Structures are given as C-alpha cells and as structure tokens.
C-alpha cells in the first residue's frame, strides 16, 4: 500500500503541512485492523482481502492486479500461458502466515485443487521481489510495482490460465473515534 499509493500522497501532504508529525507502522492487514480496533492508530491503509465490522469502515482507494513473476532461471515458463498445476513443484516465495495476502493465495490454490506452501516466507511484500530476482523461487507481486523490473529484464511475468483475484488498497477508519484536524486533513490527501 505504501509504494502503490501512499508515498505520493504523503509527499503532497508534507509539502502542505510540513510541521505535522507522521508515524507510520508496517503492519499486515490483520495487524492494522486490530491496531485500529484497539485505538492504537488513527486509520489504516491496507490491502484486500479484508474482513471488518462496524464501527470500522472501509473505502476503496485503488484497484490493482497481482501477477506471478519469476527470475531468469525460470524465464522459459513465460513463453506461453501456464496452469497453476504445472507450477506446483517449483519453489514459491510468499508472505508469511497471518497475512491476508497469504490467506488469499491459500484459498486461490485450494479452489484450483493445488496445495500452497511457500518454500521461502517473507515478512513484507517488499522482500518478495528481490528473492525472485535472485532465483530463489517464483511468486506473486503487484503488477504496477513489478512493471519496472519486468521492463529491465530482471523478472518475467508468467501468464496463468487460472485468473487471479482482483486486489484493492483500502482506507479503514474507526467511526467510534473522534479524529483530529491533522488526521482529517491527512485522510483528505489520501482519498
């Protein structure tokens, strides 16, 4: 979420309000939602899938697609569409358990009757791509962020026969809290 949407908006906010202090946390979606429920954060920017109940509210900020990418070791797989079944014996790089992304891919693989157990588990999405570039496995990555390294020939996009779920970046707020003026202004810049 940070690199997909938030950095540009925070840059503009900082130019307009240079004296407002910001504190960012790097939580998984479930951790961010829990922090919001516990009043530990003012709002959360998270990726779907997400499960929330009132008093939490979500607003979609950006739709995006993830793609399956590989390093040079597996680039021959990028020459034609492949089924997820054909890839089950390859090493996968994925996010650790306890993330909504991991849960989403567990469900995706289960729906396609394939087991999913990443060989390497990363704590954050930003850790996934360097491991793929260095041929430690194949993995899913947000297409807008992968495009530059695809264009540079560092990774290769695999075309899957089974469509991947659409993802969203969402703003989540807690309607049971009173927001400060600074928080309201920050949200205005984000949405």
Tell where the protein language model's regions lie, with residue ranges.
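Secondary-structure junction motif
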Residues: 76-77, 91-112, 179-183, 187
